[in-house]
UniProtKB/Swiss-Prot annotation:
The modification Pyrrolidone carboxylic acid is found at residue 23. Keywords: Amidation, G-protein coupled receptor impairing toxin, Pyrrolidone carboxylic acid, Secreted, Signal, Toxin. Residues 1-22 form the signal peptide. Its main location: secreted. This is Z-limacoditoxin(1)-Dv1. Extremely abundant peptide in the venom (almost one-quarter of all toxin-encoding transcripts, and the highest represented peptide by proteomics methods). One of its GO terms (molecular function) is hormone activity. It is found in: Secreted. Expressed by the venom secretory cell of the spine. The spine is a cuticular structure containing a single large nucleated venom-secreting cell at its base. It is an independent unit capable of producing, storing and injecting venom. On the back of D.vulnerans caterpillars, spines are grouped together by 50 to 100 to form scoli, of which there are eight in D.vulnerans. The modification Proline amide is found at residue 32. Potently activates insect G protein-coupled receptor. It activates the ACP receptor (ACPR) from the mosquito A.aegypti (EC(50)=0.55 nM) with a potency comparable to that of the endogenous ligand. Has no activity on receptors of the closely related neuropeptides adipokinetic hormone and corazonin. In vivo, does not reveal any observable effects when injected into crickets (A.domesticus). Does not induce increase in intracellular calcium in mouse DRG neurons, suggesting that it does not induce pain. GO terms for cellular component: extracellular region.
Length: 35
């Protein structure tokens, strides 16, 4: 169970970071610091 849960969690975390990264880089006003 843990061997399958870890990779899935890692992929979700990576996808979330990849989705948030370009938004923060392209527009600072839309970043997590400013809502």
């Amino acid at each position: 169970m843990k061997k399958t849960f870890l990779p899935i969690f890692l992929v979700i975390l990576l996808a979330s970071y990849a989705l948030a990264n370009p938004q923060v880089t392209f527009s600072r006003d839309w970043g997590p610091g400013k809502k």
